[in-house]
C-alpha cells in the first residue's frame, strides 16, 4: 500500500496520488474518457495527470468527487500540528 508519508518529494507525492486515481478508476471499471466526462475534467488533463502527474487542484477535487473520494479532502490539514511534547501534554 502506498502512503503519502513514505514519499520524499512533491513529485513522489504527485506520482502516488496519480497512481491512486488510476487504481480507483480501474477498480470502478471506468475508462479515462468515462471518468473525465463524469468529473467534468478534460480528457487531456486526466491523461496528463496519470502520465506526468500534473493537475490543477480544482481538477483533482472534481476527479475525487467523481470517484467517491471527496471525503479524503476533509482530512487534509485537519490534524493539529504539534511543535513540542509539552503542547501534547497540555491538551490532556
List the model feature ranges, each with a label.
Residues 52-65:
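Short, basic-rich loop-to-helix N-cap that marks the start of a DNA-contacting helix
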Residues 3, 74-92:
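Short, charged recognition helix plus adjacent turn
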Residues 29-47:
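Short alpha-helical DNA-recognition segment
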Residues 26, 37, 65:
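Alpha-helical residues within the helix-turn-helix
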Residues 21, 32, 43, 57-60:
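Helix-turn-helix DNA-binding elements, focusing on the entry/boundary residues of the two helices
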Residues 2-27, 76:
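A short, Lys/Arg-rich alpha-helix, primarily the initiator
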Amino acid at each position: 500500500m502506498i502512503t503519502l508519508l513514505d514519499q520524499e518529494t512533491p513529485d513522489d507525492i504527485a506520482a502516488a496520488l496519480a497512481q491512486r486515481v488510476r487504481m480507483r478508476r480501474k477498480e470502478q471499471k471506468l475508462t479515462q474518457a468515462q471518468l473525465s466526462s463524469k468529473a467534468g475534467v478534460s480528457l487531456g488533463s486526466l491523461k496528463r495527470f496519470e502520465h506526468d502527474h500534473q493537475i490543477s487542484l480544482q481538477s483533482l477535487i472534481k476527479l475525487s468527487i467523481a470517484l467517491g473520494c471527496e471525503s479524503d479532502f476533509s482530512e487534509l490539514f485537519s490534524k493539529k500540528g504539534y511543535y513540542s511534547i509539552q503542547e501534547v501534554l497540555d491538551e490532556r
